[in-house]
Each structure stands twice: as C-alpha cells, then as structure tokens.
Regions:
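Phosphate- and other anionic-substrate recognition elements at nucleic-acid/protein interfaces
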Residues: 1-154
Length: 154
C-alpha cells in the first residue's frame, strides 16, 4: 500500500514546515519538506503532488483549542488547502503515535533522518503514515514492518 502522509505546517509562522512522505508499505519512496502555509502546499501540489501514485492520503488532524490564545490555530488553513488538493484524505489524530511507532522503529526502518530538512516534520509524517496503517490493521504494511525488522536482525 502506498501511503502519502502529511504533517501540515502553520499558515502564519514562517519557520514552520510541512513534512511529506510517500511510503510503499514500510519503505520510503520519497520525502519533501515545504515552506510554511497553504500557498506553498498548493505550489508543491501543482508541480509534484498531483502526479504521485498512492492509495491513500493521511494528514495529521489538528485539534483547534479556542481557549488557548497563544496557540497557532492557522494549521487548519493549511489543512483546508491540502483537502482541496486531496478531497478523499483521511484526517488522523496523532494521540499515542509516539508510543505505537517508537523512535527505534523509525530508525530501524530508515525513517529517522532525511536529507532535505531538520527531520522533525518529515519524521512526523512518516510516523503518522505507519501509525495510520497500524491502527487500521493494514496487513501489508504491518507484515512489511515485520519482514524488514526480521531481515535487519539476521
């Protein structure tokens, strides 16, 4: 299963980035790190995102908190732009994803360090894609994780 997983950025904070990975089961096909915001995502989609082959798009679900005025809720604007490009996307909460997909697993699968960024947003996208597969019992992804770990151990 090919999963396009996206960790959306702020639409206002210029140092924020959107992390994107394309996974083939548990293997990395490609990754991208985009400058902040909706417009930069739309630009990437026009040049790259619209021609990608995938089975599902998974985007981190952002929980708006009305009572926390220090929090940047503009991520929802970036998600809205992503949804215009990929109307059938799945919004996935990330609660528990660091426990279910630990750092050591990402490292073992080669999904820890990425050339194009400081890694955090791309790593979060990779974790989100695997978390979605695990939580939804996507057998081919889970089997591939097991096979890759077994091969590394032998």
């Amino acid at each position: 299963m090919r999963i396009l997983a996206i960790d959306p950025s702020s639409n206002r904070i210029e140092t924020s980035t959107t992390g994107i990975v394309l996974l083939d089961n548990a293997g990395l096909v490609d990754s991208w790190v985009l400058p902040f915001g909706a417009q930069n995502f739309k630009n990437w989609f026009k040049s790259t995102g619209r021609i990608l082959e995938f089975d599902i798009v998974v985007v981190e679900k952002f929980e708006v908190r009305d009572n926390d005025y220090s929090r940047d809720n503009s991520v929802v604007e970036t998600i809205a732009a992503i949804e215009l490009c990929y109307p059938n996307l799945v919004l996935q909460r990330n609660a528990g994803y660091q426990t279910d997909i630990p750092n050591d697993l990402l490292k073992a699968l080669g999904l820890w360090s990425f050339e194009k960024s400081h890694h955090n947003d791309v790593r979060a996208a990779a974790r989100l894609g695997l978390f979605y597969a695990q939580r939804n019992d996507i057998e081919e992804v889970i089997v591939d994780i097991g096979n890759r770990i077994t091969q590394m151990a032998s």
